[in-house]
C-alpha cells in the first residue's frame, strides 16, 4: 500500500542529534517527553546540562547548566522538575522551577530513592520508590502524599510508566522484568491497578496501559475505561492480547461490555513486546507501540483491529500523546522524533474497502467528522427512511460526518412525510434530535422557527437563542420581527444584518446605540438624516448624538459647521453652544471659524455666556479683532481690552474704569509692553488723578519689575504725587535694597506728614543713605526729633546728634536719648558735651541719672582722654558703695589710687575685682614690682615674663614658673629663642627647686626639661635630686628617668647607674637599652632581674653569639631558653644542632620549619628522630606524611609498609603524589596500591616499565586520562597490543579521539592506528568521530579503502572534516561523493568540473546540477560541456531548463558558433517566448529553409525583432519565406507593406485578408480598384465579402457600375440590404420598449409621491437637502419641505418593504 493512502500518516518531526545532542544521551534514562509540547534531554558531558526542546520552535533548544539525575518538563507550562540523589545517601532531592519567572516553586527531600517519576496531570507529579507510590502537588506547600504500596509482582521490576484517569480515582503502574528462563528474550510486563476510592490494588500482567473516557448509548455520564496490552508465554505458547475494560460501573446505567483482541506479531518479531499505549479521544482509537517499532491501531469501542505497520527501524523507548492532532509522538534510539496522525482523507475508505468493516467506517466518520463514508451514510439514511424509522434516520442525519445530511433536501424529506394523528411529526423529531446533538444551521433554524412562530411559542425561540442552539440569519430575524421586535433585533445583531439593525435602533429611537453598533461592525449610516430626526423631538438628545459623532474614529461624518447650522436654523443657541464648546476643546487652528462663530452668537444674545467662555481661555484661534469690537459693544470692556492689539483702541476702552473691575484692569496691565503700560497709566492719571491713582499705584506695585521702578517714580514725580510715591514705594520698600528708593520713601512720608512712618523706616531700614537722610532731617527740622535720633544712633552720628540737640536747646531729647534710647552711647554724649563746654553739673547729673546703665570703661576712656578722670570719683565710689563688682569700675578706682599713691599694695593684693592685666600695665612705668604683684595675682604669664626680663627679676620669675607648674609656660621660657633661658635655668636649679617640697612641682619641672630636649641640664637636675640624698632619692620614676635620659644623652654613665640604682623598671629599661644598641647593658639588666629568655635573645639576636647563648642555656637549663637557641640554630642553617636543641627543649611546635630545613639540608635521618618525638605530642597529617617521605628518602621501604599499617593520620594520596613527583616510584607504588588509587598506580607502573600491570591498573581505574597515559607510554615502548587495549577505551570518548590519533601519527604508527580505529568500529559505544577519523586515515594512508568506507558509513561520518581531508589529499571522486552526501551541491559541481578526469560522471553531474544554488555554476557547466562533452550538452540543458537564463545560454552558444548544437534545447524552451531563443531558432529555420517551422515559430512566439526578420525574408528566394515576411508585416500592423509584398507575389487572398484585418476602409477600396485595374473580377467579388464591414456600399456599386461588374457585386448588395432592414427593425422595437419603460417609471414615481404626501402633516419642518444629495426640489407652496421619503416612516399596508427595511431616502 502506498504511504499516501495509508490510514496513519507518519513524519519525522525532528532529530535530536541534529540539535547537537550526542547519541549516547538518546536513552530512556536521559530523555523525557511528558506531552507534545516539550522534550527534555539530560546531558552529562562535556558538562552537566539539561536541553529543553520546545516542539513549537525545535530549532531553538534551550540549554541550561543543571546537574540532575532526571528532568521532567510540565505537560502544559514552562515548569521544570529536577531530581538528584544526595551524595552518600539513598535519598533524592526534588525541586520544581518556573523557567520563565526564574523562580523555585517547591523542593522536597525524599527519604527514599525515587526510581521513576512522571507528570500525571499538569499540577501533579507521581513519584515511584522501591516500595511505594506518592503524589506531589505543585500548588501550596504540601509534601508528597503516599497513595499506595507497590504489589509483589512489581518487585525487582523496572518501572516504565505511571498514569491516572481524568478523575484521579484510578491509578496504574507499569513495570517490566527479565523474561522467563525458557524464553529470556521476551520481557515480562506487570501492572498494578489501584482504586483510590476503594483503596485496593489488583496485580495483572501487562506491558502497556492507558485510561480513556467513553460515552455509552443511554448513559449521559462517560464511563472510565482501562486499556492494556500484554504478551505472555504459557507452556511455550506466546499469547498477545489487548483488553478494554470498564472501571467502576455505574449502577442502573448501561455499561461498557468488556472487549479483547489479539495482537498479531510477525514471525520476525516474536520477542518484541509493547512498550507504550496512547489513546486518541478525538478519533476513539488505541495506539499500541512496541519496542522494535511496530504500531497496532485498534478501535476503542469495539477493539477491532484497524491497522498494523512498522513505523521505525530503530527501537522505540518513549512516546507521548498528541491531543492536538489525535495522534502521538515516538522517540527511537537514533534520536528521531516521529509524529503519527490519522490520515483524515484515507482512514474511512481504508476501513470500508480494505477491512470491509462498514459499520466501523461509519462510526469513525461520525465520531471524528471524517470524509469517505458519504455513500454508506446516505444509503443507510435512505434505508431507515424507507423503513419509516424516522427517529433513527434523524439521529443518523444529526451525526452524519461533515454535515452530509444536514441539508434543505433532508428537511424537505421529513416535511413530506404525512403526520399520523396523535404522533409527533417526523420533522419535529428530526429537529429535536438535532437540538440534543448541538446547534442548527441557518436553514434548519429558519424552518424550525416557522413552525414555532406559527404555533405562537415564542418562548421556545428565546430559550434556544439563549442556549445558542440556532444559527441567526437575516431571514430568521425577518420572520421573528412579525412577533417580537426585541428578539428580532437580537437576531439581526447576531446575524450581522447591519442595515436591519440600524433600522431597528432607529425605530426604537436608540440613536446612540446606532453609533456604537456601526463602529463595531464598520457600517456607515445616514448620520445627517438621523440628526435631523432627533432634533425635532429631543434637542438635548441631538446634542448628545452630535457629540457622539464627533468622537467617532476617523472624524465626525458630518461637518461641524453643518451641524451648527442645523441647531441655529431652529434658534437653538444654547444647544449649538453646548455642542461647539465640547467639540472645540482641542483648540485646533482649523476650527478658527467655529470658535469665532460661537463667540459671535453669544456676544449678541448671551454676553454673560461669551464672557464665561472667554474667561475659561479655551479658544485661541478665533477672529480676535471682530470679537474685540463685539465685546466693546456688549459692555465687556475688559474682554475688549484683552482682544484689542492697537494702543489707541486700548486707551479708548481703558478710561472706562467705572465698568472694569480694578483688579482685572491691574492684571491686564501685565499683558502690555512696558512703553504701552506707562502710556496707559499716564492717560489714567491725566483723566482723573485722584480717582485712578489707586489703580495706577496698584499696577505699578504689581509690575514694578517689568515697568521699572525708576520709570514709575518718574511718573509720580511728573505729577508731583508724593502720595502716589508714598503708596508705591511703601509696597516695594521691603524687597528693595536701593538706598535712593528708601530715601525717596522717607522724603515722601515726611512731606505727606507720615511722621510715624518716617520714624519706623529710619528705625528698621538698613539700606538708606544715612548721611543724606541725616542732613535731610536736620534741614527739615521736624517737630519730632525721634527720626533723627534713629538715624544718628544707628549709624554712629551721636556726636552730631548731641551737638544738634544741644545747639537747638533740645536738652530734653538728650536726656531721653541717654536714659531711654541708648545708655551705652552716654560716654560719647558726655565727651561731646565736654567738647561743647557744657556745665559740669549738667554732665554729672546726666551721669548720675543713668548710673548703673552707664558703661564705665568707655566713660573712663572719654574722661581719661580729656584728663577729666577725677570727675568720675564720686560716681565710682557711689557704684562701689552700692556693691558694684564691675571690673571697669574697680580698674578706674585702682588707677585713681595708684596715681594718688594711697597705699596701692593693699589695694592690689586685697581687691578681687580689678583686671590684673589692665592695672598691671598701668603700673609698669610707675613701679615694676607693683606690676609683678598685679600680674602674679592674675596669672598674666606673658606680661610677668616680659616685665621680669625687662627688669632682670629672674629669681621672681623662677619661683613663679616653678609654682605655676604650667607646661605651656615652661615651654615658653625654655625655648632656645629665649635669650634669658640660661639665667632662668640657673635660678631654677640653684634656688627654686631646692626650695620646693612639692613632688608635683618637681615632676612638672622634670617634664618641662624633657619636653624642651635639655638632657644634660636634666641629668644635672636629676643627679642633684636623686643622688644627693634628697627627699626624692628613692623615687622609682626618677630613677627610671635618670637611666633613660643617660641612655639617650650620655650612654657612658648607663652601666654605672645600673649598678648603683635598684628601684627601676628592669624589663622596660632593658628593652630601651636594646633599642639604643646598648646590648651588654641590656644583657646585664635582664640578667640582674632573672629575665633569662630576654637575656638569651639579646645574645642571639643582638650580640649574635650562639656559643655564648649555648653556654648560657647550659647554665640556666630552661626549656624556653633551649627553644630560643634551637630556633636561632635553625635560622643559621645548623639543622642537626637545631634538631638536637629542639629535642632538649621538648618543643614540637615548630615542626613545619624543622621539616622544611631538614629537607633543604637533606638530613632525613635526624628528621626521622625529630618527627618520632613530634608524633608523641601531636597527631598531624603533615607529620605522618613527612615521616613516610623521610623513610622513602633513606630507602626504608619496609618501615613505610609497617607504618601505613599502623594507625596514622597521613594524607596518603598527597604523600603518594609527592613520592611520584620526586621519582620515588617504588615507594609511590606501595602507597597507591594501599589506597587503591588505580589511576596513579597505573602511571607509576608505567614509570617502572611494568606495562602489563599498568594496563590492569588502568582497567580498574577506568579513567580516560589514565587510559591515555598508559596508552601513550605503551606506544612509546612499542607495546602495541597493550596500547590497542588502552586505545579502545579512549576513542569511545569524542574529545580524546583526536589526541590519540595525533599521538600515533606523530610517531609514524600509521598501520597500528588504522588497526585501532577499525577495531573501534565494532564497539557498542562507537561514535561518529571514530568513523570520521578512520576515513581521514584512509584518505592519508590507505586511499584504496576510502570510497568503500564512505559509502558504507556515510550516515555516521562527520562529513565536513572528511571533506577537508579528501581535499588536502586530492581524492576528487570521493570528495565529490561527500559533497553530495552533505548537500553541498555547489562545491560538488565545482569539484567535478575542475577535476573532470577523476570526478566526472554524466548522470551524477545532472543530479548535482539541478540542486546547485549558485546561478553562475549553471553557465560554467554549459562552458564545461561545450568544451569536453558537446554531445551531451542538450541533455544537461534540458535538466537545467527551469533554472537557466535562456538568453544568456543563447549568447554563449552564439559566441561559440554552436547554435545548431543546442537546437533541441531551444525548441524545448521556446514556449517561454524568450526573444533571444526565438531569434536564434528563426535564424536556424531561415538557414535550413524550414518555412513550416518558421511559420509556426512566428505564429506562436511573437517576442523577436519582427521587422528585422521580415526585411530579411522579403528578399528570400523561396515564395513561402516571402509570404512569411508579408505575414509578419501584417502582424506588426504594417498593412501597406504586407499588401504590396502579397501583390508582388500574386497572393491575392493574402491581400484581402490583410485588408480585412487592418480595418482600414481606404486600403480595402484601393484593393478593389487594383482588382478592377488587373481585370480580376472574381477577386473583386471575393474582396467585397472578405472586406464587407469596411467597404461602403455606394463605393462598391459605383465601381461595379462603372466597370461593368454589377453581376459580381450583386451578392454583396443583397447581403447589405438584408442586414440594413434587420437593423431598422431592431431600432423600432427598442424605441417602443423604451417609451413604455419611461411611462411606467413616471407612473410609479407619481404614486410614490402621492403616498408620501399622505403623512406630510405629521412631519416637522426640515432643512433643505444638503448639496450633493441629489434630491428633487421641494413641492410648490411649501418652501423648505423636502419630499416625504427618508424620514423613517414605513409605507402603510402589507406591501413589500424596500431594501434594508427603510423607505427610499428621498432628499437624504
From Swiss-Prot:
Membrane topology recorded in Swiss-Prot or TrEMBL: Peripheral membrane protein
Region of interest called Globular terminal domain, as start-end residue ranges on this chain: 1-492
InterPro entries in alphabetical order: ARM-type_fold, CHCR, Clathrin_H-chain/VPS_repeat, Clathrin_H-chain_linker_core, Clathrin_H-chain_N, Clathrin_H-chain_propeller_rpt, Clathrin_heavy_chain, TPR-like_helical_dom_sf
Chain residue ranges for the region called WD40-like repeat 7: 315-343
Span list, region Distal segment: 537-648
Stretches for region WD40-like repeat 6: 271-314
Domain of life: Eukaryota
Gene Ontology MF terms: clathrin light chain binding; structural molecule activity
Region annotation Proximal segment: where it falls in the sequence: 653-1708
Region entry WD40-like repeat 3, spans: 114-155
Gene3D superfamilies named in the record: 1.25.40.730, Clathrin heavy-chain terminal domain, Tetratricopeptide repeat domain
Positions of region (WD40-like repeat 2): 68-113
Location relative to the cell: Cytoplasmic vesicle membrane; Membrane, Coated pit
Domain notes: The C-terminal third of the heavy chains forms the hub of the triskelion. This region contains the trimerization domain and the light-chain binding domain involved in the assembly of the clathrin lattice.
Name of the protein in its database record: Clathrin heavy chain 1
